[in-house]
């Protein structure tokens, strides 16, 4: 490999909203904030949970909710 052309590879922490902290190696260089990780994702935990980012479900129901009602 050629010296001096590859990005820096450092250890960063990825913090999830559930409190899980994951240490990974990355070229990003700064810590990450995750909404969902493997410890709290509904597919892996077997529980149903609605993940609503920014009220998108409410916004959709407000716009198109009347179409389904007769």
UniProtKB/Swiss-Prot annotation:
Task: Tell me the GO BP annotations in alphabetical order.
Answer: translation
| Record note on cofactor | Binds 1 zinc ion per subunit.
Q: Which domain of life is it from?
A: Bacteria
Q: Name one GO cellular component term.
A: ribonucleoprotein complex
Q: Which GO terms describe its molecular function?
A: metal ion binding; rRNA binding; structural constituent of ribosome
Entry keyword annotation includes Glycoprotein: no
Pfam families linked to this entry: Ribosomal_L31
Please list the residues that bind Zn(2+).
16, 18, 37, 40
Keywords tagged on the record: Metal-binding, Ribonucleoprotein, Ribosomal protein, RNA-binding, rRNA-binding, Zinc
Per its UniProt record, the required cofactor names are: Zn(2+)
Query: Known PROSITE patterns for this protein?
Result: RIBOSOMAL_L31
Regarding protein family, the annotation reads: Belongs to the bacterial ribosomal protein bL31 family. Type A subfamily.
Q: Kindly state the subunit structure of this protein.
A: Part of the 50S ribosomal subunit.
- What function does the entry list? Binds the 23S rRNA.
Descriptive protein name? Large ribosomal subunit protein bL31
The species this protein belongs to is Shewanella oneidensis (strain ATCC 700550 / JCM 31522 / CIP 106686 / LMG 19005 / NCIMB 14063 / MR-1)
Q: What is the lineage of its organism?
A: Bacteria, Pseudomonadati, Pseudomonadota, Gammaproteobacteria, Alteromonadales
Q: What would be the name of the gene that encodes this protein?
A: rpmE
């Amino acid at each position: 490999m050629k010296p001096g052309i590859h990005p820096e590879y450092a250890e960063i922490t990825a913090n999830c909203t559930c409190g899980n902290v994951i240490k990974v190696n990355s070229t990003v260089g700064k810590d990450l904030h995750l909404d969902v990780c493997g410890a709290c994702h509904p597919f892996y935990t077997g529980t149903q949970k609605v993940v609503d980012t920014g009220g998108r479900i409410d916004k959709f129901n407000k716009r198109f909710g009347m179409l389904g009602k007769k």
